[in-house]
A protein has these predicted regions:
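CN hydrolase (nitrilase-like) catalytic-core segments centered on the catalytic cysteine
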Residues: 156-172, 189-200, 207, 289, ...
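Extracellular, repeat-based ectodomains that mediate carbohydrate processing or recognition
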Residues: 478-890
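Bacterial N-terminal signal peptides
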Residues: 7-14
Length: 890
């Protein structure tokens, strides 16, 4: 094997401890895979080594002309480079490896995937039989992947292990495989002889799968060649040295595409195993707190919310996207922008998304995309369209740090007079030739010819914070039109910056109650602050629970208030920092925030995690709903379901599952629910949640007529039927006429942005009105010149004859909080207005929630103006019910 000169600093070959804030040079490698690179183990290794180093001998035989590398941008070649580097390779970087060697010769001659994969069964028959006996009952194609274990680890694992060591960098790369161990011939010569590639008869070891679950897996290699994995308690281990010799992957893909799924959902697919959402963990490393979202996982709301809750700040998105510029009925870069790009904007703590996109044809299956490094949007002008500020067929945006090229530049760069439709039509004309154009002159050719896909390497230096301070302070202020000055609820931070997250609010009379969770030691604790003067100022925050400070992880508190009493619920982790077992807790307080009694446990089982509890009062009785993982699905995976309970006497009614109905076959392993909302009154309890039963995220609703003891039929609220819709975070409000108002974050029609949508039920939730967009972000929108923006996290409140709404909105660049009202029961909404007072500042305002009391709308949100996340609030006069007293002064 060819090697470059030794790394100058030997210390780079060991895993350094987690460091303070500093720059990391991040690379996205979007290579083109070719059958020629999988003839021998050396061919595959040479391809990857040539991508890493432009000085690799005969590089032009493996890499397209003009493609950058990694090595020339590392120390000592670049003395100005940061000391740490992270290199991300695409999803399916190990797919072609199944063709390696004499056993893959027949498969390499095929012209389709359906010809190539079955051609491997005969040459791998002995290994197939071994795993059939060891793991009976597995789908045939999954057993084939098990039979391929030695080939895959010999090629993929050893290549990237050695490249990480050689270059002293962190490398993330992805293949379809099960966890494995290396077996030495001295230990078990017969097993090694059985599993070892016959092309290497003198090799003194082989790799054996130790699980039947061959899965789409990302491996994060440290500079010493070890794979970094989580211990489930927030600590990062090295594999195999700290995992009993088993080589484990860092992250397993949870939400499989149809072609990846096993029967009966898909009979001609890869039959991969599903990862558990609960097992997707953040890796704390010197290059950031890494979270990996493999392709479809980047769009999944529960996956991303969990990573946010676990403190991720660097998102790795290995991709094998199926098309890019082939069709105009849905624009693939727009669909792609819904995922990792949008989530970096949505979650203020996320600093960067590294998207490495595979290109090239795998027989008749094609992959294409533009690798990119994505940061946070700003209020700055992105400037004219360029190769560096948009994917093809899109308008310029400020979120791009680096973008790989496509086979042709966007024609709008050279001719700004072109409409968006004209630009996309020209791009599609070029893109179709990748599928049906004339043959390319060779396999590395780029351009408008069959399989002329472009590969690329892009990089950027990114400052990664350690600790709660994530940005520079924002001193800019601008008075909103109707809301008063924004004020910090979460109190002074005498011991240094503390990050506060996920605020919620309730109000009753002159009292306003805000709750949130904040980091204390290694875990989060729930806090509450009380205002006794209509939100003018808040008293010192206090712990909610009776747990010792920092002893138990407490997250996502929610609060409800009635005259003379408030109730606060929160989730606890029941096994250290693991989210595999949890509790839902409730505490009651008097109107001044003084605790009444002890903490009470709401859920009735130790099985499974518990997430996102919500509380409301039915009369003077608390009712609660939450996400509960006690139920198991296929592959014994825990599923996220909606459970509810009602306070009774000194305890609670038996927990009852509120969601009902069978999932479609594609969602059988993924019958998950998320982000419940609750409202109650008159003995009725109303729930809404996001639901994946249809292999899309929809908003579903259920009503209980007996105070939460049982629930009726589930009703779908959103009315869009297109594929891969993503609707989340519902909010509910009830009015005196018994109407149910619902709003949610809505992603429909394969558009690149989310909006706030609204529907109303006039029959208690039996059916809902046609959906309509609540926010006005698209008024005056010109698709030829304007860039779509995102609206998230709606919160509804009803008072008198008016419906009020607040939400997170980045129409101005970065996140702000906006507000509107409807005086006619949701038929029309007033023009939206700003809530926060940061004007044109760079800070982020996110996750708002609203409450109404005595003529005032109170909004709380998460705010980074101080450099770390704090809880802020603002208020404005809002319509009061007739005859209900005077409005206090704002």
């Amino acid at each position: 094997m060819w090697t470059r000169s030794l790394i100058a600093v030997a210390a780079m070959l060991v895993v350094a401890p987690a460091a303070q804030a500093g720059d990391v040079r991040m690379f996205a490698v979007g290579h083109k895979h070719r059958v020629q690179d999988a003839v021998t183990y050396a061919d595959y290794r040479n391809k990857m080594a040539a991508l890493m180093d432009a000085g690799f001998p005969n590089r032009s035989a493996y890499v397209q002309a003009g493609v950058d590398d990694v090595a020339s941008h590392l120390r000592p070649a670049d003395p100005r480079a940061p000391r740490r580097a992270l290199v991300v390779f695409p999803e399916e970087a190990g797919l072609i490896n199944i063709l390696i060697g004499s056993r893959g010769e027949t498969s390499r001659r095929q012209t389709s995937v359906l010809g190539a994969v079955p051609s491997l069964f005969a040459p791998y028959a002995r290994q197939f039989d071994h795993y059939t006996a060891k793991y009976p009952g597995q789908p045939a194609v999954r057993l084939l992947f098990l039979a391929l274990t030695d080939t895959l680890y010999r090629s993929f694992y050893e290549t990237f292990r050695d490249l990480a060591r050689e270059h002293g960098v962190y490398i993330a790369s992805t293949m379809n495989a099960a966890p494995a161990r290396r077996v030495e011939a001295a230990e078990d010569p017969d097993l090694v002889a059985l599993l070892r590639d016959p092309d290497e008869p003198d090799r003194g070891y082989a790799y054996e799968a130790v699980s039947p679950h061959a899965a789409n897996t990302t491996y994060v290699f440290a500079p010493n060649g070890e794979v970094l994995v989580s211990d489930g308690q927030g600590r990062t281990l090295q594999s195999p040295s700290q995992t009993a010799g088993v080589i484990r992957g860092s992250t397993v893909k949870a939400y499989l595409t149809p072609s990846e799924q096993p029967p009966p959902a898909e009979f001609l697919g890869l039959a991969l195993a599903f990862g558990a959402v609960q097992d997707m963990e953040v890796l704390d490393t010197p290059v950031g707190r890494l979270a990996t979202v493999i392709s479809k996982d980047a769009w999944m709301i529960d996956v991303n919310d969990r990573f946010e809750a676990k403190g991720a700040n660097v998102i790795l998105q290995p991709e094998a996207f199926s098309d890019w510029g082939f069709r105009t009925d849905e624009w693939a870069p727009d669909v792609f922008k819904e995922g990792g790009f949008a989530n970096v904007q949505k979650y203020p703590a996320w600093q960067v998304n590294v998207d490495a996109s595979l290109t090239g044809a795998f027989f008749n299956t094609v992959f294409d995309g533009q690798s990119a490094i994505i940061g946070r949007r700003t209020k700055a002008d992105p400037g004219p369209l360029s190769p560096d500020n948009a994917w093809i067929g899109q308008n310029p945006d400020t979120g791009f740090l680096a973008v790989g090229p496509w086979i042709e530049p966007d024609p709008g760069i050279a001719d700004p007079s072109l409409s968006l439709a004209q630009r996309r039509q020209q791009l599609t004309t070029a893109g179709l030739k990748l599928l049906i154009g004339p043959p390319c002159p060779d396999s590395l050719a780029v351009g408008q010819c069959r399989n002329g896909y472009r590969e690329s390497i892009v990089w950027e230096d990114v400052r990664i914070p350690r600790g709660p301070v994530t940005a520079r302070p924002d001193r800019v202020r601008g008075a909103p039109p109707a809301f008063g000055r924004s004020a910090r609820v979460s109190g002074k931070e005498k011991q240094g910056p503390v990050a506060q997250h996920a605020p919620r609010v309730a109000a009753q009379g002159r009292y306003v109650y805000a709750v949130w969770h904040e980091q204390r030691g290694h875990v989060s604790n729930a806090f509450m602050a009380v205002s006794r003067n209509h939100g003018r100022h808040f008293h010192k925050p206090a712990r909610v629970s009776a747990n010792a400070a920092g002893a138990v992880a407490e997250m996502f508190p929610s609060v409800a208030a009635i005259d003379g009493e408030i109730a606060v619920t929160w989730q606890e982790l029941a096994a250290g920092r693991s989210d595999e077992r949890g509790r839902v807790m409730l505490a009651r307080f008097d109107e001044k925030g003084r605790k009444r009694g002890g903490d009470a446990r709401v859920d009735d089982t130790d099985e499974g995690g518990k997430w996102l509890p919500q509380v409301a009062y039915d009369g003077r009785t608390p009712v609660l709903a939450w996400i509960d993982e006690r139920d198991r699905g296929p592959q014994d995976l825990p599923l996220e379901h909606v459970y509810a309970a009602r306070a009774v006497g000194g305890g609670f009614t038996p927990n009852v599952r509120a969601d009902a109905g069978a999932p479609v076959p594609l969602a059988a392993h993924l019958d998950n629910k998320w982000s419940p909302a609750i409202a109650a009154g008159g003995g009725k309890v109303y729930l809404a949640w996001a639901d994946f039963r249809n292999y899309n995220w929809d908003i579903f609703f259920a009503r209980s007529d007996d105070g939460g003891r049982t629930f009726g039929a589930n009703v779908k609220v959103d009315d869009f039927t297109g594929f891969e819709r993503i609707d989340e975070r519902p909010s509910l409000a009830l009015d005196p006429l018994g109407r149910v108002h619902a709003a949610w974050t809505d992603l429909r029609a394969r558009e690149p942005d989310t909006n706030i949508f609204y529907a109303r039920s006039d029959n208690g939730g039996a059916s809902f009105s046609p959906n309509r967009q609540l926010d006005d972000s698209k008024q005056g929108f010109d698709p030829d010149t304007d860039t779509p923006t995102n609206q998230w996290h709606p919160s509804l409140a009803w008072a008198g004859e008016t419906l009020f709404a607040a939400w997170q909105d980045n129409r101005l660049g970065n996140n702000d909080v906006f507000f509107t009202s409807s005086p006619d029961g949701g038929a029309t909404f007033a023009p939206s207005e700003r809530v926060d007072d940061t004007g044109s500042g760079h800070s982020e305002q996110s996750r708002p929630q609203m409450a109404w009391a005595e003529g005032l709308c109170h909004v709380v949100w998460e705010d980074t103006r101080s450099g770390n996340a704090d809880v802020f609030t603002a208020r404005r006069p809002c319509a009061a019910p007739p005859g209900k007293g005077k409005k206090p002064k704002p």
